[in-house]
Regions:
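Alpha-helix N-cap and loop-to-helix initiation/capping positions
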Residues: 43-54, 85-99, 127-138, 161-165, ...
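Histidine-acidic metal/acid-base catalytic patches
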Residues: 1-6, 13-30, 60, 106, ...
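Active-site beta-loop-alpha junctions enriched in small/polar residues
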Residues: 8-12, 37-39, 71-73, 121-123, ...
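Short beta-strand segments at enzyme active-site cores
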Residues: 34, 67-70, 113-120, 154-157, ...
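Generic signal for short, ordered secondary-structure residues
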Residues: 2-3, 11, 37-38, 87, ...
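Active-site acidic/histidine proton-transfer and metal-coordination neighborhood
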Residues: 18-19, 61, 75-184
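N-terminal pre-domain/capping segments
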Residues: 1-109, 209, 271-286
C-alpha cells in the first residue's frame, strides 16, 4: 500500500500558503502538515473564519489532505520560543495555550483534518516535575473535551528536551488522563533515532495503536537536529516497511516530512524528499 506523504509548511515559510500548497500538489504529495503561524494561517487573525473557508476550498481543489500542527515558535509570545506552554507557571499563560489549541481543534474540524498535533513544552526553571505533569493533564483535559466533541484526535508529540520527551512519557500521560480515546500520538521518526532505546522501525510498530500523525526526517543519535534524508544516521528501508504495515493496518493519516530549519531550500527539499521516499517504496516493491 502506497504511503500517504505530506510536507510541513514550517519548512516552507518563505512561500505564501497558496504557493506552498500548489507546489506540493504539483510535486505529487498527498497532503500537507499545516503549522498555524502568522505567515500562513494565523490562528489569531480577525478574519480567521474567512481564511479557513478559502483554505478548505483550495485543499479540495488540489485534493490535498491536511493535519494541523501547533509548533509555531512565537505565535503567542514574540520573546519566548514556544511560550507560553501548557507548563507555564502563570495560569493565564497556560490558559492562552489552551485557547490556541482549542482554536486549532476547531480549525482542524472545519478543514476535515486527520488530527491536531501538540506538545508539552519545556519544564520551566523552578517547577518540579509533579506540578508540571498536573498542569499538563489539567490543561489537556480541557482541550480533549473539545476534541472529543468534534471527533478530532489530539496527537501529542514526544519532543527532545520537553517534559514529555519519550514514548514512555506519552504512555505516562495516557495513564494520568485515564486513557481517553481522543488522545493520540504524533510519532517523529527522527526523535526515535535521537532518544529512544528501540530502533525507529521498532518504535513505529510498538506505538502503532496510538499513532495519529507521523513526522519523518533524518537525524543523528543524541542530537536533536532535523536533517534532510541521507544526512543523518537512520536506516530508512525498515522504517518505511513499518510505516507500510501501519498504513495497511488502517492508519488514515499522513507521513509528513519535517524540516523546519530548511525553508531557505524548501521547494528543492520538498522535491528531493518525495523522490527519496518514493524511491525507497519502489525498491521495497521490486
Amino acid at each position: 500500500m502506497t504511503l500517504r506523504l505530506a510536507y510541513g509548511t514550517n519548512g516552507l515559510t518563505d512561500l505564501r500558503l497558496d504557493d506552498a500548497l500548489f507546489l506540493l500538489a504539483d510535486l505529487g504529495y498527498d497532503g500537507v502538515a499545516l503549522t498555524l503561524d502568522h505567515m500562513h494561517l494565523d490562528p489569531m487573525a480577525p478574519d480567521l473564519s474567512d481564511r479557513v473557508g478559502r483554505l478548505a476550498r483550495t485543499l479540495r481543489t488540489l485534493e490535498l489532505s491536511v493535519t494541523i500542527e501547533t509548533g509555531a515558535r512565537y505565535i503567542l509570545d514574540a520573546r519566548r520560543k514556544h511560550g507560553p506552554s501548557l507548563l507555564d507557571p502563570d495560569p493565564e499563560g497556560r490558559a492562552a495555550r489552551v485557547r490556541m489549541l482549542m482554536r486549532a481543534v476547531q480549525i482542524a474540524a472545519d478543514l476535515g483534518a486527520h488530527a491536531v498535533h501538540c506538545f508539552s513544552g519545556v519544564l520551566p526553571d523552578g517547577v518540579d516535575p509533579d506540578s508540571a505533569w498536573k498542569w499538563l493533564t489539567d490543561e489537556l483535559s480541557i482541550v480533549l473535551y473539545t476534541a472529543t466533541g468534534l471527533g478530532m484526535p489530539l496527537a501529542v508529540e514526544p519532543e527532545p528536551g520537553h517534559l514529555l520527551a519519550t514514548l514512555a512519557d506519552f504512555h505516562h500521560l495516557r495513564h494520568l488522563l485515564g486513557r481517553p480515546d481522543a488522545l493520540g500520538l504524533t510519532l517523529d521518526i527522527g526523535h526515535c533515532q535521537c532518544l529512544e532505546r528501540a530502533s525507529p522501525a521498532d518504535c513505529v510498530r510498538s506505538a502503532a495503536p496510538w499513532v495519529r500523525h507521523v513526522q519523518i526526517e533524518d537525524m543523528r543519535r543524541g542530537i536533536h537536529e532535523h536533517l534532510p534524508f541521507g544526512a543523518g544516521e537512520i536506516d530508512f528501508p525498515p522504517v518505511l516497511d513499518a510505516l507500510a504495515d501501519l498504513t495497511h493496518d488502517g492508519y488514515p493519516g499522513l507521513i509528513s516530512v519535517e524540516l523546519p530549519r530548511h525553508s531557505h531550500a524548501g521547494p528543492s527539499l520538498a522535491k528531493s524528499s518525495l523522490h527519496y521516499l518514493r524511491g525507497l517504496e519502489k525498491g521495497a516493491h521490486a
